[in-house]
């Protein structure tokens, strides 16, 4: 089988989400015989939730983490764990499986990064931790999180593998015992190709992590890759899955990979709002969008802004238009080469650019702390995508502002779906604008 087929780019808006209900098979005749990784969804109520250690910490020291990790946490400026970290970390470090839903920006990534680094006893030439996510940018970001939290753990080696780059470079890293990673982060297509070609050995994996798990398990082809990789790992490993959105349909599928997991739903489906985020919409025609966007960028105070559009073509055209209007922007989408995408991501992350035009490739998990304005130039197709998009502003409980353009009947339907799903009434953007103190930290 060619690598071209293996390295499908799952990361952009062209990927159509399959109906989760359609993937639900008939209940198994004997649930007790189900194996981890068996994707036949049993009927009935979910299994009893795993017990967990309740803790109300005032600091990360209460988790009894390695001293090297505590030093790195202090260097990063973190003083108090978030709610999801307080609930998950004390149990996760005891090797318990974890299924966690929590809003964007509440520190889910740090849960599995700190947990796996605390547990890790690196052995040269062995991969002990495997982390998968659905986009290259998110994989790159997770790798960087491992780098900053492992700064005082010099023996820990981390590598990131994803499609769009020459696979030979990955093979070279894996062929050298000196560079062989203890922690592997990557996208399912590339990782499955490396495993199938016997370049990456997973026989020593002790922790198996899926970030934005619903995005991967919703897609038939990506789920197949995840399942193949899962079966190449030992049966007694720890499994952790995280997302901002976990529907009732996807939860049983996730739990098929686990044994009596700790289930953490920091907010239920109707309360997945984002604290500190001011949310508005503007009704206008398609032809009025550019003028209105120009007005907003001129009048609003912001640190960095991300502008979401529905296609790569529109991203390129809008980016070009903004630069012609003297707004220094960049565009990030799947049509850009991998090397260029990472370069642009770093430019934006390092505050060299303040305006980013993006498709849904930037809609999940990407954590850039200075973003405090998100504009839906094109509304997404559903409420979940809306939540992930606007969650780029107001990360980790900080203030932020989101504005959505509503230009047709489909947009109005999505707006109503958002209001119904999250039990909020989105107000129309006021004619006089908004006070910057309500969204500027």
From Swiss-Prot:
Region (Disordered): 19-43
Principal location: nucleus
Sequence motif DEAD box, residues: 211-214
One Pfam match: DEAD
Compartments, record wording: Nucleus
UniProt keyword list: ATP-binding, Helicase, Hydrolase, mRNA processing, mRNA splicing, mRNA transport, Nucleotide-binding, Nucleus, RNA-binding, Spliceosome, Transport
Catalytic activity: ATP + H2O = ADP + phosphate + H(+)
Ranges for domain Helicase ATP-binding: 89-264
InterPro entries: DEAD/DEAH_box_helicase_dom (IPR011545), Helicase_ATP-bd (IPR014001), Helicase_C-like (IPR001650), P-loop_NTPase (IPR027417), RNA_helicase_DEAD_Q_motif (IPR014014)
One annotated Gene Ontology cellular component of this protein: chromosome, telomeric region
SUPFAM superfamilies listed in its UniProt record: P-loop containing nucleoside triphosphate hydrolases
All copies of domain Helicase C-terminal, residue ranges: 276-437
Enzyme Commission (EC) number: 3.6.4.13
Biased composition (Low complexity): 19-29
Any Gene Ontology biological process: transcription elongation by RNA polymerase II
Top enzyme class: hydrolase
Described purpose of this protein according to its UniProt entry: ATP-binding RNA helicase involved in transcription elongation and required for the export of mRNA out of the nucleus. SUB2 also plays a role in pre-mRNA splicing and spliceosome assembly. May be involved in rDNA and telomeric silencing, and maintenance of genome integrity.
Family under the similarity heading: Belongs to the DEAD box helicase family. DECD subfamily.
UniProt comment concerning the protein's domains: The Q motif is unique to and characteristic of the DEAD box family of RNA helicases and controls ATP binding and hydrolysis.
The protein's name in its UniProt record: ATP-dependent RNA helicase sub2
Organism: Aspergillus clavatus (strain ATCC 1007 / CBS 513.65 / DSM 816 / NCTC 3887 / NRRL 1 / QM 1276 / 107)
Recorded name of the encoding gene: sub2
């Amino acid at each position: 089988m060619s690598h071209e087929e293996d390295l499908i780019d799952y990361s952009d808006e062209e990927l159509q989400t399959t109906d989760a209900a359609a993937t639900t098979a008939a209940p198994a005749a004997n649930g007790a015989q189900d194996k981890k990784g068996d994707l036949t969804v049993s009927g009935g109520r979910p299994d009893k939730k795993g017990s967990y250690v309740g803790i109300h910490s005032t600091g990360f020291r209460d988790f009894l983490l390695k001293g090297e990790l505590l030093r790195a946490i202090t260097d990063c400026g973190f003083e108090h764990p978030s709610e999801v970290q307080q609930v998950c970390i004390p149990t996760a470090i005891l090797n318990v499986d974890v299924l966690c839903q929590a809003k964007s920006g509440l520190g889910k990534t740090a849960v599995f990064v700190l947990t796996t680094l605390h547990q890790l006893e690196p052995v040269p030439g062995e991969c002990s931790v495997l982390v998968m996510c659905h986009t290259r940018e998110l994989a790159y970001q997770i790798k960087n999180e491992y780098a900053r939290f492992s700064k005082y753990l010099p023996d820990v080696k981390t590598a990131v593998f994803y499609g769009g780059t020459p696979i030979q470079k990955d093979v070279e890293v894996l062929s050298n015992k000196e560079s062989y990673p203890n922690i592997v982060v990557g996208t399912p297509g590339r990782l499955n190709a490396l495993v199938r070609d016997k370049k990456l050995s997973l026989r020593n994996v002790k922790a198996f992590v899926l970030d934005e798990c619903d995005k991967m398990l919703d897609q038939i082809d990506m789920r197949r890759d995840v399942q193949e990789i899962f079966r190449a790992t030992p049966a007694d490993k720890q499994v952790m899955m995280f997302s901002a959105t976990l529907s009732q349909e996807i939860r049983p599928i996730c739990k098929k990979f686990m044994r009596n997991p700790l289930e953490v739903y920091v907010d239920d489906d109707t309360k997945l709002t984002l604290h500190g985020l001011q949310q508005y919409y503007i009704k206008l025609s398609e032809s009025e969008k550019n003028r209105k966007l120009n007005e907003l960028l001129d009048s609003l105070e912001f640190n960095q802004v991300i502008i979401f559009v529905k296609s790569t073509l529109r991203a390129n055209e809008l980016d070009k238009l903004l630069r012609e209007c003297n707004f220094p922007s960049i565009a990030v989408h799947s049509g850009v080469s991998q090397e260029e995408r990472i370069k642009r991501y770093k430019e934006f992350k390092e505050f060299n650019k303040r305006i980013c035009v993006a498709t849904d490739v930037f809609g999940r998990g990407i954590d850039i702390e200075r973003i405090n304005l998100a504009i839906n130039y094109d509304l997404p197709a559903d409420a979940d995508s809306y939540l992930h998009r606007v969650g780029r502003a107001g990360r980790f409980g900080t203030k932020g502002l989101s504005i959505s353009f509503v230009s047709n009947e489909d947009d109005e339907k999505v707006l109503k779906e958002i209001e119904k799903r999250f039990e909020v009434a989105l107000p129309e953007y006021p004619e006089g604008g908004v006070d910057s103190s309500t969204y500027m930290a």
